[in-house]
Amino acid sequence: MRTLHTDTEREAAAALVQDRQRWLALRRLPVAAGADIPALFRDPRTQPAGLFEDGKLLACMIPKREPNPGWGKGPCLFLGSVHTLPDQPDDITRLITLWASDFAARLDLPLVRAEALVRHTLDAEPIAALLRRLTNMGWEIQGSGPGQEGDRVARLEITAERRSGLSTLIGCRVHEPHTATPKERGNT
């Protein structure tokens, strides 16, 4: 896992996001409507991060130190705009989960929070299957409501936990994320 520093890396992340959005749309699954997510990954000010294996980008996200994302209580590491390469196993999500929990603990943050787009109730398929997989990985569902980008989301959190030995499985070269500003959170 590393911060995406170069224009080439950020462009690869934007392309991954577009591929994932197309994949979701073809399956009639929810896609973020309110924001140009690929543009966020092209912007070096967002400090996006990517999960690589053998030089191949498997996932990307925008990690932020968040004092309060508008739901939940207290500070957290917020994983914004998480996208994985289409048609990949859940192992990628599991690695992101382990990394994020460990990274948050190393930043002295108590929690990791993330959001998953939803269209219907949380017990309706296909979101219910995704949420079951995430809860099996340790995530807790904190209800649903408007997300950081204004779309309806399932709100997720997991406790930060140092995971000794994780560095043999996944390396971390992610810069400490900045604190999200009210403008970045959509608050003015």
Language-model-detected regions and their locations in the chain:
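Active-site rim helix/loop that mediates acceptor-substrate recognition in acyltransferases
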Residues: 25-53
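Conserved acetyl-CoA binding element of GNAT-fold acetyltransferases
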Residues: 71-86, 115-116
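Conserved GNAT acetyl-CoA-binding A-motif
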Residues: 104-124
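Conserved beta-strand in the GNAT
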Residues: 50, 56-67, 78
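C-terminal "cap" of GNAT-fold acetyltransferases
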Residues: 142-188
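Conserved acetyl-CoA-binding loop-helix of GNAT-fold acetyltransferases
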Residues: 88-106
